[in-house]
């Protein structure tokens, strides 16, 4: 199966970011695979890119919460890599869940 990039942009997902003096791109996909297995996201240090699938496997859009969770999951893989640790899936998943909850529940005095 072949990865399919999308032309869509999401206002809550950056196109680039810099951490640890490394600039990473974020690419959004209609379809994303690893050895023919569908993926929600992928961190690639060699290419310095995070790839995010923004559609369900049936072609319908994923929710903002699911996309953010996937983005944070892959971002935490980048943190782990730069911290010189293995890509622990459970750690990245836990941090992504906590970050999503933080982002969706925070309230400011002006709101």
What is the predicted role of each segment?
Residues 15-65, 78-82, 87-93, 97-98:
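Active-site scaffold of zinc-dependent metalloenzymes
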